[in-house]
């Protein structure tokens, strides 16, 4: 049957065939609602009990984490078709997970083994529990210049210790390299919000044994009031000066050693960091540095049926031509992320041009052996906060070098972005014919807004999404 069927889910049937990791990962991004796990998928261990091979164990644990129903099936030697007996862990568990199955039930040992695997799944961390409501939930990116952030948004950002640890270390290294001991250095925080980077900069100066003056620039009048209270409460009156206003037009007559900002978005430049920092770099001394110094944007093709279903459920063109911020959960990366472009600060070009264009290709060899469905592209950033003699400090949500916090948790200030495509594309890996994915993306800017346009050219030609910013844009 044709059409989209978001209310129809797949049932995976796992028999005796060995389960490869790539095969299972291919299904993570699809509409899988349940798994029929045949007793023939089990092997007997040295003690005579049924167990699953390691690859299948890993798959089952992942299904538990992703809330996929698992049903044991017993074919009793019958032909393939409907199982004669089925049993699901959720159907027969009593209080505290006790088993209420008759001890003589022929599938009891298999069921108990699944219970054992379920209990072995590590409990969700506090961070994972906090992020759970955002899993595969589409969020529109911020409009940082047009809108003032709400207090709850600031609070969420400020909870991410890992980000501010990285920023503090970057400022410390910059002060060591730029300010001689005994001299007074200067730091300007643009987009200071409620003050977390001001606090991080002051801590960095203490660790570097450098005296500094901090200038805080903030356009949100509510955040300015909070900053003023913070400065008074902490007794920073002689060390911190506040300039209310837009960093691009602020009249502060100062020149600083370090220009600090947390204007990065999930795709690096999507919250107008280039445009904002170009306007603020006039505050830097000729020898001054920006924190961050540079940031690189990446994209990767993904299978994400749940996300695509959510996008098309809005039934309008705007929704399919909008990139979203998403905490990925039921998503499969068809291939590895690749770089699209980079921005560096300060930008000393005679004519500053923040428009970008990239063509990215994934070859047949890079797509793996499992067929999949392309629903869109994941987007990430990797930033160099500071790189100098005193050290190199990075901040990243790239899957392979995601910044970690002090206890090993992932930095959570940014979720990845999702660029949907209007029509999903089947990536067929069954035959010998070569298959490749070719993706084009543009960053466009005019006097009033910034927007992205994107399309695919292979394996099929798609149309350009969001031409001239007709559906989505970020206001300047």
Mark where each language-model region is.
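Pre-Walker A adenine-sensing motif
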Residues: 173
């Amino acid at each position: 049957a044709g059409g989209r069927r978001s209310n129809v889910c797949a049932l995976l049937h796992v028999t005796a065939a060995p389960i490869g990791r790539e095969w299972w990962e291919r299904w993570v991004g699809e509409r899988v609602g349940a798994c029929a796990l045949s007793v023939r998928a089990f092997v007997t261990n040295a003690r005579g009990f049924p167990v699953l091979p390691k690859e299948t164990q890993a798959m089952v644990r992942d299904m538990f984490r992703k809330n996929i129903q698992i049903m044991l099936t017993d074919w009793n030697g019958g032909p393939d078709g409907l199982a004669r007996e089925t049993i699901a862990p959720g159907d027969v568990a009593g209080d505290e997970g006790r088993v209420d199955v008759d001890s003589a039930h022929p599938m009891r040992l298999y069921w108990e083994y699944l219970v054992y695997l379920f209990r072995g799944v590590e409990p969700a961390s506090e961070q994972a529990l906090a992020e759970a409501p955002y899993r595969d939930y589409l969020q529109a990116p911020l409009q940082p210049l047009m809108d003032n952030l709400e207090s709850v948004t600031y609070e969420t950002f400020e909870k991410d210790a890992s980000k501010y640890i990285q920023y503090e270390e970057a400022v410390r290294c910059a002060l060591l390299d730029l300010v001689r001991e005994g001299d007074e250095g200067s730091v300007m925080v643009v987009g200071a919000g409620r003050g977390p980077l001001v606090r991080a900069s002051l801590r960095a100066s203490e660790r570097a044994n450098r005296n500094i003056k901090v200038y805080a620039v903030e356009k949100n009048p509510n955040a300015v009031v909070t900053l003023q209270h913070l400065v008074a409460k902490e007794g920073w009156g002689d060390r911190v000066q506040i300039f209310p206003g837009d960093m691009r037009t602020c009249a502060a007559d100062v020149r600083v050693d370090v220009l600090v900002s947390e204007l990065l978005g999930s795709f690096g430049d999507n919250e107008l960091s280039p445009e904002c920092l170009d306007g603020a770099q006039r505050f830097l001394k000729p020898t001054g540095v920006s924190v961050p110094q540079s940031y690189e944007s990446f994209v990767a093709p993904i299978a994400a049926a749940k996300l695509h279903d959510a996008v098309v459920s809005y039934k309008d063109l705007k929704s399919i031509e909008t990139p979203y911020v998403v905490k990925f959960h039921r998503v499969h990366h068809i291939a590895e992320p690749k770089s699209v472009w980079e921005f560096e600060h300060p930008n000393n070009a005679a004519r500053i041009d923040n428009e970008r264009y990239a063509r990215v290709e994934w070859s047949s060899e890079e797509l793996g052996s499992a067929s999949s469905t392309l629903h869109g592209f994941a987007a990430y950033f990797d930033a160099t906060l500071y790189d100098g003699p005193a050290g190199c400090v990075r901040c990243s949500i790239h899957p392979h070098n995601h910044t970690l916090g002090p206890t090993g948790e992932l930095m959570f200030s940014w979720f990845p972005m999702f660029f949907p495509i209007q029509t999903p594309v089947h990536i067929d890996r069954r035959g010998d014919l070569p298959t490749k994915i070719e993706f084009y993306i543009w960053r466009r800017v005019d006097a009033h807004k910034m927007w992205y346009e994107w399309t695919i050219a292979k394996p099929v030609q798609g149309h350009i999404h969001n031409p001239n910013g007709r559906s989505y844009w970020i206001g300047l």
